[in-house]
């Protein structure tokens, strides 16, 4: 797993945002105007001092939409809740998994080919943040 910290940008570059919803089915004429401009940093990074990026590897989270090579935006200031996708270390080994707190603590892969990782009272589990966004290339 590769970790990256966001760096200070010299210039904020707001990008055009078209509020028109783009149908995924039959094409329809689109509106020809920009409603506003958005800055991806503002959209993706709520807590700059506690946000970092991780490059995912493997296929254990494909059913959660995380593929090999995707860039994950992680907020380390958020408390991890039941059902969150987290960056965790169990016995010092990093992983990205869905956190299950009830009825027992487990790290759940989102791929039926993998088994959940039970976390017992004798195990060391560290949570390094909650995944807030997935950035992926589509071509």
Curated annotation (Swiss-Prot):
Gene Ontology CC annotation, any one: protein-DNA complex
Family listed: Belongs to the peptidase S24 family.
CDD domains noted in UniProt: S24_LexA-like
Keyword Nucleotide-binding among record annotations: no
Naturally occurring in which organism (per UniProt): Salmonella typhimurium (strain LT2 / SGSC1412 / ATCC 700720)
Alphabetized UniProt keyword annotations: Autocatalytic cleavage, DNA damage, DNA repair, Hydrolase, Protease, Serine protease, SOS mutagenesis, SOS response
Gene Ontology molecular function: DNA-binding transcription repressor activity; sequence-specific DNA binding; serine-type peptidase activity
Protein name: Protein UmuD
One Pfam family per UniProt: Peptidase_S24
Recorded superkingdom: Bacteria
Signal sequence extent: none
UniProt-annotated catalytic positions: 60 (for autocatalytic cleavage activity), 97 (for autocatalytic cleavage activity)
